[in-house]
Amino acid sequence: MRLNTLSPAEGAKHAPKRLGRGIGSGLGKTGGRGHKGQKSRSGGGVRRGFEGGQMPLYRRLPKFGFTSRKAMITSEVRLSDLAKVEGDVVDLNTLKAANVIGIQIEFAKVILSGEVARPVTIRGLRVTKGARAAIEAAGGKIEE
């Protein structure tokens, strides 16, 4: 297979409309745009959300909420993800090294999702009640 020989499957693409090729084609003269008006002109049309001069919906409704900057640097870690970490100690740096969390993450919380197969030591991470019970049941421990 070569890139220059690739083509779409037969019948997968519709032929483009050939506009302005005589009245017999059905798309001659006005080319499917009707007569006059803003939408018939080249470059004609209105922007998204424009309601003809009436105050548009997105401006009639109040602003609300914000994006928490802390949420951008916080991540959840599942119990099943702990198996991807080499070694017995799990902290922020070992999670980043194992590609479990992104490089920009500064806070992480271990949640109860999946199972933990081996005893691990959690260091410097927040842990939910259920995850704490599962880690301790597997013989692991949590260090603050």
Swiss-Prot record:
Residue numbers spanned by region Disordered: 1-53
Key words, A-Z: Ribonucleoprotein, Ribosomal protein, RNA-binding, rRNA-binding
Single Gene Ontology MF annotation: structural constituent of ribosome
Skewed-composition ranges (Gly residues): 21-31
Signal peptide positions on this chain: none
Gene Ontology cellular-component terms listed: cytosolic large ribosomal subunit
Any GO BP annotation: translation
Protein family per UniProt: Belongs to the universal ribosomal protein uL15 family.
Purpose of the protein: Binds to the 23S rRNA.
Summary of subunit composition and partner proteins: Part of the 50S ribosomal subunit.
Protein name (database record): Large ribosomal subunit protein uL15
Organism per entry: Pectobacterium carotovorum subsp. carotovorum (strain PC1)
Primary gene name: rplO
